[in-house]
Amino acid sequence: MEEEKILESDLRHISFVMPKYTPIEKIGEGSFSVVYKALDAESGRYVALKAITRTSSPARVLDEMMFLKTLGGRKNCMGLLGCFRNEDQVVAVFPYFEPIDFREFISNANLADIKRYLHNLLIAIEHVHSNGIMHRDLKPGNFLYNKESGRGMLIDFGLAQYEEYSEGQHAEGGAKPAGPLLFFNSVVSKTKPPGYYERDGRPPMKAPRAGTRGFRAPEVLFRCQRQTGAIDMWSVGVIFLTILTTQYPFFYSSDDIDSIVEIATIFGHAEMRKAAKFYGRVWRSNIDSIPEERIPFETIVESLNPWAEIGSDGYDLLYRMLDLCSSSRITASDALSHPFFDDLKTHENCA
């Protein structure tokens, strides 16, 4: 993890916790927070201080703290040691966890490393989902992994929601479209092929759009109103594909339209039409770079990383994670029982 020196100006918004915690260095920064490595004066242990920016919604901050409390720091989910408030400044305190840089990890990860990484991540996701929570922003930066110990920690629940919060029905199973027909016919950011797209003059469908570009599930990009924990499993699949191909980020799109087209260049028109119908949408495109039939993941992985050794079980798990239709996408619980992890579980039982 990249570390930065702390400027005096940075300390103003965490000064009220400094009698108890001594900041050492900045270790992360996002849209709504800055994270510091600090020393707990009482215990002598390192902690992580998450200073939440003033622009954050108070309700969102409260929700994040409640989700952390619910998950209880168990099963590879980051625990909350404490939370301090001074007027509109909030600082959350977490155990310090030393991760490996994700790019460094994928550059030399062997099959056993990949299995341990994914297994740790799935344990966390299964725990989150079993409590009725969707993380909604899964990406390598939000899953800290220590290769030496073989342990991981899921962090940042700032965009999490309970599943029942995202209500309304999308048109699953071939129902009539629930809103305007959307025509995704833009250009892919890397290849820039010729193509067209039709704009619908009606107001766009409103739906949750959490997540980071490149990791958003098809139902998020199709703006389906009802979303489930399946969106997290798509993100896990993208992480899996990223590790196998050693291409980070794997998807480069700058907006949702291009993201859909970029996915289509892999899945092809035939599967995109089926997925669009499943979500009550219509798929139409004339972009030459999109094939009629999908490109197998085996072809993609072997072309980008000829040295990858994953086997049929690994590919089967990848296909089931990156299923365009949310209802048939594998769950975290089922993924943990997948044969891909059989030898890992045998090794753990013998340890």
UniProtKB/Swiss-Prot annotation:
Role according to the record: Serine/threonine-protein kinase. Needed for the initiation of DNA synthesis during mitosis as well as for synaptonemal complex formation and commitment to recombination during meiosis.
Positions that bind ATP: I27, G28, E29, G30, S31, F32, S33, V34, V35, K50
Gene: CDC7-1
Pfam families for the chain: Pkinase (PF00069)
Catalysed reaction equations from the record: L-seryl-[protein] + ATP = O-phospho-L-seryl-[protein] + ADP + H(+); L-threonyl-[protein] + ATP = O-phospho-L-threonyl-[protein] + ADP + H(+)
A molecular-function term among this protein's GO annotations: ATP binding
Protein keywords: ATP-binding, Cell cycle, Cell division, Kinase, Magnesium, Meiosis, Metal-binding, Mitosis, Nucleotide-binding, Serine/threonine-protein kinase, Transferase
E.C. numbers: 2.7.11.1
Cellular component terms per the entry's GO annotation: cytosol; nucleus; protein kinase CK2 complex
Record-annotated active site: D137 (proton acceptor)
Cofactor: Mg(2+)
Protein name, UniProt field: Probable cell division control protein 7 homolog 1
Organism the protein comes from: Encephalitozoon cuniculi (strain GB-M1)
Family statement: Belongs to the protein kinase superfamily. Ser/Thr protein kinase family. CDC7 subfamily.
Protein kinase domain segment(s): 21-341
Gene Ontology process terms (BP): cell division; meiotic cell cycle; regulation of cell cycle
PANTHER family: CASEIN KINASE II SUBUNIT ALPHA (PTHR24054:SF0)
Enzyme category, top tier: transferase
